[in-house]
Amino acid sequence: LLLEAYYDTGNLLIDPYVGKPVSIIDKELLMPIFREDEPVVRLLPFSSMGEKNGLVEALTVEELYIKEGKKERQILQAVIALGSPSLFQKKEYQMILNCHLL
């Protein structure tokens, strides 16, 4: 799955179960990949300006590649939260990268 992403310095979400930074993807883009097998998701607590005590579904993917220009980085066992499609409406990106992945 190839998509545009945005580094968000305000995305400080860390998975409390595995201690890894969490990036957010448009849920509708990711779910078709899991047609036959339901992904194993867990609920992560989060707080934001709009939601003080929220929960978001997240999963761990084997690898995530981040490409900037000619440089490419591989993140193993990356944690991805499943964001609401409305979060990405009228945006030029489909994923919000955690600032700790810079």
Predicted regions span which residues?
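Pepsin/retropepsin-fold aspartyl endopeptidases
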Residues: 1-102
